[in-house]
Every structure is written in structure tokens, then in C-alpha cells.
Regions:
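A conserved catalytic-core segment of Leloir-type glycosyltransferases
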Residues: 1-52, 245
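Short N-terminal targeting/anchoring amphipathic segment
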Residues: 43-63, 78-84
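Glycosyltransferase donor-sugar binding loop
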Residues: 202-206, 216, 225-240
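N-terminal subdomain of nucleotide-sugar transferases
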Residues: 1-4, 48, 73-78, 141, ...
Length: 259
């Protein structure tokens, strides 16, 4: 549904997202479709004439990256990219750590992660995709690359794309201290049956790349502590007895109580 807030713009449609996802899987190229949706977005950007465009996650089957970047480059619009993952600096991977792949630091190809994230059914286009991204961002008039941690920023610096950036720096995820403040710990401990020392992890969906394996190892090595994992976990995964699972929640208050 289109947002009621006039300051928000809804890109494309649900049908376009599904079609983009299908074409991406067939072609092996993510971010090369949604022509009409991107054309309409460009018209909107032309209308509001922003001082800067801030890019976040664009690998959700809804944007044509070459079309968007050509417009921004031609109009010399400054671009900020925040790295919530590493899709912008790889052929297709969001998380290269799962396969310990470092090819993206020079040139992708023969990708070990074709089934990760936006999977491809037939073709490995990662070499072409990274070349395209490098060329696109080399033409950006003013480019800032922002990592959400020091580690992420250090990894971004290893990319060929970083040499075209005017700024590469970390800006850490902020915490709303009006919501996250010391709470009554007894309430949460009683609710979930937590005794003694605890460790907590939060993820919308748990997987190896989100650290699930590390939390399981921690629980096995330290059976005297309680590990609380908030988020969805595959039912087929066997967990140690000292791991407590809490379903995903959109309640800030519930998360704050657990923290």
C-alpha cells in the first residue's frame, strides 16, 4: 500500500517485486529490472531535487541500479551508502564471511555463494556485476561509504569501489535512550525463567551467518549460563537446554526489558 505520509514514496508494486525476483533468479543479475518502477522513482527525485541521496539496501527486487545511478551521476547528486551488508561491494553476496571468500577485494567470479540471498538458478554473473558496480560508483560526483561498525568499515576499505569514495567512515547504529534504559530485571527474568548470568542475541531470523552456531557453542561450553535468543529459529535445529528462545517481536518495550 502507498504511504499516507506525503514525505514517503512507495517504489513499484508487489507484482513488480515478484517479476524482478523471478528474472533475477533466471538471469543471475539482481538490480537490473524494475524499469518502470525506477523510471517513476527518477521522476520523483527530479521533482524534489534532493541535496543528497542516501542508499541503504537495494537488493530487494524493486530497483534498477544502473538506471538509478546513471541519473544520479548525470545530475551530479551526492550519494551516501550505508552498509547494512556488503551487497554494494560484491558481485552478489550480502555476507561473504559465510564462505570466507575474499575475491570481491579484486574481482568476483566462480562464486561459492550463488545460493545465498538472492539466489540464481543458472548463471554466475558475479564478475560482470562487480565490474558494473565499480564503474557506476566511479562516476559518482561525491560518494560517501558508511559502515555501521568499525569492522564493516574496514572491510569496505578493501573494496576497489572505496578508492572512488570521498568519505569512508563508520557511523554506529544509534540507541534511543528514551526507550532503552535500565528496567526491572526481575520482571523479565520471572517471565522467561532466567536464573543467574545470561547472554542475549537478537535477530529477525537466526542462521549460521547471524551467529547461531556461535551462540550454540557458547551455551555448550558454559552450561551454567542462560542464553536467550530472540527471533525465529528453524524447528529442525537442536539447541542446548540452557538456550531459551523468544519469538520475534516488534515491541521495543519487550526488547528493552530483555536487554
Amino acid at each position: 500500500n502507498k504511504p499516507d505520509d506525503p514525505n514517503l514514496y512507495h517504489i513499484g508494486s508487489a507484482l513488480d517485486v515478484k517479476l524482478h525476483g523471478l528474472l533475477s533468479r533466471i538471469s543471475g543479475k539482481q538490480g537490473y529490472f524494475s524499469h518502470l518502477a525506477t523510471r517513476n522513482l527518477v521522476k520523483y527525485i527530479e521533482k524534489i531535487k534532493p541535496d543528497v541521496v542516501h542508499l541503504h539496501n537495494l537488493h530487494g527486487n524493486y530497483i534498477n541500479l544502473p538506471m538509478l545511478m546513471k541519473y544520479l551521476d548525470d545530475k551530479k547528486v551526492p550519494v551516501v551508502i550505508t552498509f547494512h551488508d556488503f551487497w554494494f561491494i560484491t558481485g552478489k553476496c550480502m555476507y561473504f564471511t559465510t564462505s570466507n571468500c575474499e575475491k570481491w577485494q579484486e574481482q568476483c567470479g566462480n562464486c561459492p555463494n550463488l545460493q545465498d540471498g538472492n539466489r540464481t538458478w543458472f548463471f554466475d554473473k558475479t564478475e560482470e556485476l562487480l565490474k558494473d558496480k565499480t564503474q557506476m560508483f566511479s562516476k559518482t560526483d561525491k560518494l560517501a561509504l558508511v559502515g555501521v561498525s568499525k569492522w564493516a568499515t574496514d572491510e569496505v576499505c578493501k573494496s576497489p569501489i572505496a578508492r572512488y569514495a570521498d568519505i569512508v567512515k563508520p557511523i554506529y547504529n544509534w540507541v534511543d535512550i528514551s526507550k532503552f534504559y535500565p528496567r526491572d530485571i526481575k520482571k523479565a527474568r520471572d517471565k522467561y525463567g532466567i536464573n543467574g548470568f545470561m547472554a542475549i542475541g537478537v535477530s529477525s531470523i537466526w542462521s549460521e551467518r547471524k551467529g547461531l552456531k556461535s551462540f550454540i557453542e557458547l551455551a555448550e561450553k558454559m552450561p551454567e549460563i542462560t542464553v536467550v535468543l530472540v527471533g525465529t529459529i528453524n524447528e529442525g535445529i537442536e539447541l542446548p537446554k540452557n538456550i531459551i528462545t523468544v519469538p520475534s517481536t516488534s515491541s521495543i518495550d519487550e526488547l528493552a526489558e530483555l536487554y
